[in-house]
Structure formats: structure tokens, C-alpha cells
């Protein structure tokens, strides 16, 4: 099987590529624009494989997209290329509209044109797997907002869309496009929506790597509001396994929610990281003393939580990592891979961190 992975140099994309090359006999064509969060160092361990090839390209380039399909005789697409940071979408939404909506449209058209020329058997087996987020659903009631005897709601595959940021709105739009191409043209598409990912090779603008690295450098650990926002945390290698299961075994036209069964308040995640660092690299004062509370993000969703029963029941996937095991592996990875960290911390990244957090004191 030959799979086109878009955004394969990003955090989740690189985990998918590593999983496919290391654990299957399938081949990967990785198409990535290499924006600030794309890093080929994350693929160093598999880059010499004969089953792996890389194209430095933009999915918004219709001519290029069509070329890759024809050249490589693809059996499936795993579409992960996206602008994905909520804070960046608030200060600069245009890039999110261009990549997440227009880019998805261009890729869908390239896939449809290629698929329409396949023989019947290959048409039937072809898959266009669009990887999305649980943020398209909006947010859920917080435990502080409901009676103690009430059952807390979870996002299911039939939850109505209610995106609340430019990022989630752009992903919701792309989800609708993918489903429309299935219904209108018959293109065999699948959508998956995941909870918050964490793990090795995570670009340090996101909460967990930001906290780990700031703590080690003696910097403030910025927490939005009171830190009581709740997220369901999914170890990235568990997610990569799930995505491969979906593209190879999932049913065309279906949606699969993928979650880690690990609901945690943001502040508790930060406490856990600080306590692990106190254990592994102790210093005179606890890392918790570096925690700083900053003004909350506009429109910050209160709670996300995934019901992953469908993918477990129909495809047999379950996460292997608990949050406790996964976060320890993550902290240990960052401690052992300081060269990777230094190489991704460019001047552009540093200026963005200063712009985003210094104004929130």
C-alpha cells in the first residue's frame, strides 16, 4: 500500500510516518510545506528507508498535488497538513483559512481526479482520510457547572459542530468539505476527530513542551486563567496507531473519534510535569514555584472530552498509554533530546512566544 501523508513533518504527521515505516510494509510519500512547525529531524530515523520519500510542497498547489497522485500511484491519503495553534489563529486567521480550508479543497480535487481514473477495484479500496480535531464540537459542560449527580457529557461522532476559534472553525469547514466530496462525488472519505495530543517531537508552542522547556530554563510557566480548563490527553504514538487503523480498516463515509480517556485540568497537567522534574532533575526549589497565571485566551473552551467507544468497538483500537506513563516518557524524551529542542527554537519562534505571553501578565 502506498500512502500520501500531508503534513508528515509535523508533530502528529511525523509520528504517523514513523509508525508506518517502522511497523508495516507500506510506503509513504510525505508532502510538507515545512512551515515553522515542520521539522525533518523528527523523521531522521526513517529517512533512509526505500519505502519513504519526501516532497517539499504546499497542498494549495493544485498542479503539484495532481503530479504526486499520478507519479506515485497512491492507494490512500492521510491528510494532516494544517495550521493548528489556536492562539496563532486569533492573531493571524488568514493562514488558517488558506491552508485548512482552501488547501483541503485543492487536495480533495486532486484526489477526486486521480480516483476517477482508477479501475473499479482500486476505486473501491481507495481512501481519503481527513484528520481533524475535537475542537470542532465547541466545548462541554465543566464539572464545576453541573450537579455532582449528573453524568458528564462526551463528544460523540454525532455531536453538533459549534467551533469557537478561527482554528476550529477552519477545521470544521474542512470536515464539511470532505463529507460533501463523499456525498456529491462518491470519493471514499473518512474523517477522524482527536483529543489533545502530547509526546515526543512536539513543537514547543503547545502547553506540555512549553512547560517542560520553560521549567528547565528557569522561566515562568504561563497558565491561562485559573488553569481549570479540562482536556482529554492522547499520547501521539497511540494516535498514530489509531490513524493507521482508520485508513486501513475504517469504512468510507464514517467518522471516528479518537481519545485517550485522560481528562485533566491544565493546572494538574502542569503540576504533574513539575513533580516529575522535581524527581528527575531536582533543584533547590520546586518547579511549581515558576507557575505564573496570565490573562485567559479569548473564547477559551472550558472542557473537551472524547467518547472513543466507536473506534474501540468497530476497529479494535484502544490507547496503550495512561497519562502517567505517557507524560513520564514525554518528559524523559525532552531531557534526552536537547539537540532537537535547540534546533527548533528559532528566532521566529522566540519572538512569537514573547508576543503571545508577555502581553498577558
From Swiss-Prot:
It is an enzyme of class 4 (lyase). Pathway: Carbohydrate biosynthesis; dTDP-L-rhamnose biosynthesis; Bacterial outer membrane biogenesis; LPS O-antigen biosynthesis. It comes from the Bacteria. The active site is at 134 (proton donor), 135 (proton acceptor), 167 (proton acceptor). Keywords: Lipopolysaccharide biosynthesis, Lyase, NAD. Homodimer. This is dTDP-glucose 4,6-dehydratase. The gene is rfbB.
Amino acid at each position: 500500500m502506498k500512502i500520501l501523508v500531508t503534513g508528515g513533518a509535523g508533530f502528529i504527521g511525523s509520528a504517523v510516518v514513523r509508525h508506518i515505516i517502522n511497523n508495516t510494509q507500506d510506503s509513504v510519500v510525505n508532502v510538507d510545506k515545512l512551515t515553522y512547525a515542520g521539522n525533518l529531524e523528527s523523521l531522521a530515523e526513517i529517512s533512509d528507508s526505500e519505502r519513504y520519500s519526501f516532497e517539499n510542497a504546499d497542498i494549495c498547489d493544485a498542479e503539484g498535488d495532481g503530479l504526486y497522485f499520478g507519479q506515485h500511484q497512491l492507494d490512500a491519503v492521510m491528510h494532516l497538513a494544517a495550521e493548528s495553534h489556536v492562539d496563532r489563529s486569533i492573531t493571524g486567521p488568514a493562514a488558517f483559512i488558506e491552508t485548512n480550508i482552501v488547501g483541503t479543497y485543492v487536495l480533495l480535487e486532486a484526489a477526486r481526479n486521480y480516483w476517477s481514473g482508477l479501475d473499479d477495484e482500486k476505486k473501491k479500496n481507495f481512501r481519503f482520510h481527513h484528520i481533524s480535531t475535537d475542537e470542532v464540537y465547541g466545548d462541554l459542560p465543566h464539572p464545576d457547572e453541573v450537579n455532582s449527580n449528573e453524568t458528564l457529557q462526551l463528544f460523540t461522532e454525532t455531536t453538533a459542530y459549534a467551533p469557537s476559534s478561527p482554528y476550529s472553525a477552519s477545521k470544521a469547514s474542512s470536515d464539511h468539505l470532505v463529507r460533501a466530496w463523499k456525498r456529491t462525488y462518491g470519493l471514499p472519505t473518512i474523517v477522524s476527530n482527536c483529543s489533545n495530543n502530547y509526546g515526543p517531537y512536539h513543537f514547543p508552542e503547545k502547553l506540555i513542551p512549553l512547560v517542560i522547556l520553560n521549567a528547565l530554563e528557569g522561566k515562568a510557566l504561563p497558565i491561562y486563567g485559573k488553569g481549570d480548563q479540562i482536556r482529554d490527553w492522547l499520547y501521539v504514538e497511540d494516535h498514530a496507531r489509531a490513524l493507521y487503523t482508520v485508513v486501513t480498516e475504517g469504512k468510507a463515509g464514517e467518522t471516528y473519534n479518537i481519545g485517550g480517556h485522560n481528562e485533566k485540568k491544565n493546572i494538574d497537567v502542569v503540576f504533574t510535569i513539575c513533580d516529575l522534574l522535581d524527581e528527575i532533575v531536582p533543584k533547590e526549589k520546586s518547579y511549581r514555584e515558576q507557575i505564573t497565571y496570565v490573562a485567559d485566551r479569548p473564547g477559551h473552551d472550558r472542557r473537551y472530552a472524547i467518547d472513543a467507544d466507536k473506534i474501540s468497538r468497530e476497529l479494535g483500537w484502544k490507547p496503550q498509554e495512561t497519562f502517567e506513563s505517557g507524560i513520564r516518557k514525554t518528559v524523559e524524551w525532552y531531557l534526552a533530546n536537547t539537540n532537537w529542542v535547540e534546533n527548533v527554537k528559532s528566532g521566529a519562534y522566540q519572538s512569537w512566544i514573547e508576543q503571545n505571553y508577555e502581553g498577558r501578565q
